[in-house]
């Protein structure tokens, strides 16, 4: 049983970029499709199949509506990792006899970078664009990187580690003018910030269910129909999902994703106000009480559900142990098992000391003001204690530049 403190249940969940709790309304919508409405949506000869198919198509239209897409442009997958792989490898395989170059960004999610590395082994040329110290790409650098051999540009909308929002509209405009396909991993922005695939000229977009209060194991790939985008499937079989993704569709999970998208569509404004208020409260109160705390990533051009903070003079891992009543992360959930400093922070030019002290705090739909205040009090008291014990902090206070120290190796 979790301990309770003045109606506050501990530990407090603050890792909304890793996953989100399922919204009770989503759970309620899914349950009948686990029990009485169990039909296969591909069974065309009886009412069990028709009922499941109707539910799938209704969910498909809800997902499409949230990004201004046509219902037929939504392909269901197992999640954003599969969607990213299908988009990048699928385009590369289909168009490789005409073009052989893809552009992405050094700070993309691991699955995008690894899909690109896989293609490099197959002879595709990949350009990894750098990011500025605020985490945003430079549009001129992108323009200059595009050649007549470029088939695809892949840039995520909201970074999973630092929360910065890339200028998708401008990127889409450049890609359309140059005749290059534009893919975006929108998993962290879908349902949280306004995204319009037509206004942004996006050709492919990857979506995840469990980042928007839906179930795990379900996602989608938006694939533009006009002008038509072709991808070679990764999974072959019964030819479901316009031949791009074979396999029996998991009706309950799809219904959950659809319901999560519907709620996000109607409550985005409310959620945004709530998250922005808590972000400002959290950051302002931390800054009032402790010095040398740095927000990683652009303060304004970001999704404010993400606070990635570096605490000078404190080791990130010891900080996480000290604040064990807060469920937080020291990088993306996929790579936080490694003690290497975050590759995203390093690519922003952040030094090893501050990169090692970075912690990502996530705020979401169910975070309360009371939880934020508890978190701030806990963080400030623990930082003070850890800094008292830290020889590095003492040296910094004496004006010693830690970068210039030659550490002896024993």
Swiss-Prot record:
Residues that bind [2Fe-2S] cluster: 334
Pfam families registered for this protein in UniProt: Aminotran_5
Keywords, in A-Z order: 2Fe-2S, Cytoplasm, Iron, Iron-sulfur, Metal-binding, Pyridoxal phosphate, Transferase
Catalytic reaction annotation: (sulfur carrier)-H + L-cysteine = (sulfur carrier)-SH + L-alanine
Highest taxon of the lineage: Bacteria
Residues that hold pyridoxal 5'-phosphate according to the record: 80-81, 160, 188, 208-210, 248
Primary enzyme class: transferase
Biological pathway: Cofactor biosynthesis; iron-sulfur cluster biosynthesis
N6-(pyridoxal phosphate)lysine modifications at: 211
Active site: 334 (cysteine persulfide intermediate)
Predominant localisation class: cytoplasm
EC numbers for this chain: 2.8.1.7
GO biological process: one example: [2Fe-2S] cluster assembly
InterPro entries documented for this protein: Aminotrans_V_dom, Aminotrans_V_PyrdxlP_BS, Cys_deSase_IscS, Cysteine_dSase, PyrdxlP-dep_Trfase, PyrdxlP-dep_Trfase_major, PyrdxlP-dep_Trfase_small
Listed cofactors: pyridoxal 5'-phosphate
Locations listed in the record: Cytoplasm
Gene Ontology CC: one annotated term: L-cysteine desulfurase complex
An annotated Gene Ontology molecular function: metal ion binding
Quaternary structure and interacting proteins, as annotated: Homodimer. Forms a heterotetramer with IscU, interacts with other sulfur acceptors.
Family matches, as HAMAP family: Cys_desulf_IscS
Cross-referenced PANTHER family: CYSTEINE DESULFURASE, CYSTEINE DESULFURYLASE FAMILY MEMBER
Functional description taken from the UniProt entry: Master enzyme that delivers sulfur to a number of partners involved in Fe-S cluster assembly, tRNA modification or cofactor biosynthesis. Catalyzes the removal of elemental sulfur atoms from cysteine to produce alanine. Functions as a sulfur delivery protein for Fe-S cluster synthesis onto IscU, an Fe-S scaffold assembly protein, as well as other S acceptor proteins.
Family: Belongs to the class-V pyridoxal-phosphate-dependent aminotransferase family. NifS/IscS subfamily.
Protein name: Cysteine desulfurase IscS
Species for this entry: Rickettsia conorii (strain ATCC VR-613 / Malish 7)
């Amino acid at each position: 049983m979790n301990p309770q403190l003045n109606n506050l249940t501990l530990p407090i969940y603050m890792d909304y970029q890793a996953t989100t709790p399922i919204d009770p309304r989503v759970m309620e919508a899914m349950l009948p499709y686990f029990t009485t409405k169990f039909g296969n949506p591909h069974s065309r000869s009886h009412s069990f199949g028709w009922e499941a198919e109707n539910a799938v198509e209704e969910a498909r239209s809800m997902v499409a509506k949230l990004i201004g897409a046509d219902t037929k442009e939504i392909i269901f997958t197992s999640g954003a990792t599969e969607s990213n792989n299908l988009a990048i490898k699928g385009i590369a395989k289909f168009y490789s006899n005409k073009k052989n170059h893809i552009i992405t960004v050094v700070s993309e999610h691991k699955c995008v970078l690894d899909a690109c590395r896989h293609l490099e082994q197959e002879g595709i040329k990949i350009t990894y664009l750098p990011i500025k110290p605020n985490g945003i790409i430079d549009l001129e650098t992108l323009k200059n990187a595009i050649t007549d051999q470029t088939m695809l540009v892949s840039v995520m909308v909201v970074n999973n580690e630092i929360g910065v929002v890339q200028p998708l509209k401008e990127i889409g405009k450049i890609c359309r003018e140059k005749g290059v396909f534009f893919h975006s991993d929108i998993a962290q922005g879908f349902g949280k910030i306004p995204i319009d695939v037509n206004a942004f000229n996006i050709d492919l977009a990857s979506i995840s269910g469990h980042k928007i209060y839906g179930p795990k194991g379900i996602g989608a790939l938006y694939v533009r129909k006009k002008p038509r985008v072709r991808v070679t499937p990764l999974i072959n079989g019964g030819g479901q999902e316009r031949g791009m993704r074979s396999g029996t569709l998991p009706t309950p999970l799809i219904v959950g994703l659809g319901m999560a998208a519907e709620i996000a569509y109607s409550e985005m404004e409310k959620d945004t106000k709530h998250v922005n208020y808590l972000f400002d409260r959290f950051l302002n109160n931390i800054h009032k009480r402790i010095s040398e705390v740095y927000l990683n990533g652009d303060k304004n051009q970001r999704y404010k559900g993400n606070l990635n903070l570096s605490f000078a003079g404190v080791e990130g891992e010891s900080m996480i142990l000290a604040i064990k009543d807060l469920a937080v992360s020291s990088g993306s959930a996929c790579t936080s098992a490694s003690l290497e400093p975050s590759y995203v922070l390093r690519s922003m030019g952040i030094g090893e000391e501050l990169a090692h002290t970075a912690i990502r705090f996530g705020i979401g739909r169910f975070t309360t003001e009371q939880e934020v205040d508890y978190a701030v009090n806990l963080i400030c008291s623990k930082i003070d204690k850890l800094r008292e014990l830290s020889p590095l902090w003492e040296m910094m206070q004496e004006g010693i530049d830690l970068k210039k120290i030659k550490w002896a190796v024993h």
